[in-house]
């Protein structure tokens, strides 16, 4: 059986060629991530084209995710490029545009002096350097260095616990979003989500561009953790972005946030990605640490739809080895069968039908579950149940097929639009009897809507024996 948990790979200089990306697809990449925190539009456009070319060559459906930078707060530039702050020193972070010195440097967050209060923490470079606000003098925030270390131009600053006043989309994000939509990406990931309402700003831009695609909420802020259930309901998918999350909330809370996010996302049939530092040591090394292997396996056993690679594939020494290694770890974890069952009992029509179809298929010892879908919803509702049976998904929409590349276990087939149930069964027979894995009279449990092609109309479970419809055109 194919690997069920999907792999997201971040593109970058290490794979920036047609052959490099083709090999990633062949190694097992299911979704390509364009990271708009780095690179420029021509770079992303070229990578996009290479992914689509690789999809055409291999026949594999590979989704493309545009990850917006978000309102990232950064230090300004230092006159010398960098400095080292020692523990116990006093430094000034100013909203004035100044050339940075050892003692005083600017920030991109122009409301810092208004929002900061004595006792507030400022964490630089993913928490490697720690500051605490002592006082505010005019446009300067006076800080004591609590954890010293090197700092350099444009390093990121996290403000855990501070009520900051920044929009969900920066001007750069809006430009990047419009560009990505015109390009044709399959997903948008929104950084530093704080509230369910943040998705409305993205939808407004999408409506102006005349194109809506799924929006992924990145869990990185304490506010997002507090509003987790409402954010899951508002967005189309979730990413547990453990890097920034581990800076913003206490480190020991991150594993439990991950488990809770996966559980809530599964209950609502929303795909969930676990991201950041999964095989981080493989940026330099040919083998992961044992802890990293356990981390990947535990994400699989928690029930994640996908696991994500960042620097490992974008700038790592051997990105192809990384993907193959992750795929091996995932496959072995999946053989264990310990993903907890969905304790949430569905109450909606589509939820109950998918739940019943899973039970029928497993009790009848069917060869596979089959879904016909125009939106992808039926497939996601079946996927969250994590049946041991293959999940074969038929759709007439190429974009839906690409979007299902993020959904656990979904093996997708592009098919023509059909007019009735007989047409569906003919498409199932045509596709599956051409494969070595399936033979005539194999039992399939098919979930669909009748009449076909109506979004949200899932209302049918059909037990089908391959080849029983003799009207398949020769």
From Swiss-Prot:
| Xref: Pfam families | PK, PK_C
Task: Write out the entry's keywords from A to Z.
Answer: ATP-binding, Glycolysis, Kinase, Magnesium, Metal-binding, Nucleotide-binding, Potassium, Pyruvate, Transferase
Which residue stretches, if any, does this entry annotate as coiled coil? none
Pathway-wise, it operates in: Carbohydrate degradation; glycolysis; pyruvate from D-glyceraldehyde 3-phosphate: step 5/5
A GO MF annotation of the entry reads: pyruvate kinase activity
What gene, per UniProt, encodes this protein?
pyk
Could you say which residues are annotated as the site Transition state stabilizer? 218
What is the similarity comment for this entry?
Belongs to the pyruvate kinase family.
Stated name of the protein:
Pyruvate kinase
């Amino acid at each position: 059986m194919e690997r069920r948990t999907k792999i997201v790979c971040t593109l970058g200089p290490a794979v920036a060629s047609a052959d490099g990306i083709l090999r990633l697809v062949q190694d097992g990449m299911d979704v390509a991530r364009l990271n708009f925190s780095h690179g420029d539009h021509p770079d992303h456009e070229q990578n996009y084209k290479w992914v689509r070319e690789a999809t055409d060559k291999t026949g594999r459906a590979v989704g493309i995710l545009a990850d917006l930078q978000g309102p990232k707060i950064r230090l300004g530039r230092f006159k010398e490029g960098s400095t080292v702050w020692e523990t116990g020193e006093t430094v000034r972070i100013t909203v004035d545009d100044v050339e940075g010195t050892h003692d005083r440097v600017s920030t991109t967050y122009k409301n810092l002096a208004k929002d900061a209060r004595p006792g507030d923490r400022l964490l630089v470079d993913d928490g490697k350097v720690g500051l605490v606000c002592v006082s505010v003098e005019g446009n300067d925030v006076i800080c004591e260095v609590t954890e010293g270390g090197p700092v350099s131009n444009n390093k990121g600053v996290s403000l855990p616990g501070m009520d900051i006043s920044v929009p969900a989309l920066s001007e750069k994000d809006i430009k990047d979003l419009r560009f990505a939509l015109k390009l044709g990406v399959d997903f948008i990931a929104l950084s530093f989500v704080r509230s369910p309402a943040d998705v409305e700003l993205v939808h407004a831009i999408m409506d102006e561009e005349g194109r809506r695609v799924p929006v992924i909420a990145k869990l990185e802020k304490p506010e997002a953790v507090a509003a987790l259930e409402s954010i899951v309901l508002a967005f189309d998918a979730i990413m547990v972005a453990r890097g920034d999350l581990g800076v913003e909330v206490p480190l020991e809370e991150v594993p439990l946030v991950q488990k809770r996010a996966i559980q809530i996302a599964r209950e609502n049939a929303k795909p969930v990605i676990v991201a950041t530092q999964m095989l981080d040591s493989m940026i330099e090394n040919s083998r992961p640490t044992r802890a990293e292997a356990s981390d990947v396996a535990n994400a699989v056993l928690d029930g994640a739809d996908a696991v994500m690679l960042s620097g490992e594939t974008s700038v790592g020494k051997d990105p192809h080895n990384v993907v193959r290694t992750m795929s091996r770890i995932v496959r072995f974890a999946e053989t264990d069968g310990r993903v907890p069952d969905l304790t949430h009992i569905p109450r909606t029509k589509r939820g109950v039908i998918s739940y019943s179809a899973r039970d029928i298929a497993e009790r009848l010892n069917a060869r596979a579950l089959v879904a016909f879908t125009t939106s992808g919803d039926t497939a996601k509702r079946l996927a969250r149940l994590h049946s041991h049976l293959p999940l074969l998904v038929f759709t007439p929409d190429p974009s839906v097929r690409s979007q299902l590349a993020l959904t656990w276990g979904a093996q997708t087939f592009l098919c023509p639009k059909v007019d009735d149930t007989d047409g569906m069964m003919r498409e199932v027979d045509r596709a599956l009897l051409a494969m070595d894995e399936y033979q005539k009279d194999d039992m399939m449990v098919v979930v669909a809507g009748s009449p076909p092609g109506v979004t949200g109309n899932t209302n049918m479970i059909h037990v089908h024996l391959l080849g029983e419809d003799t009207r398949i055109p020769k």
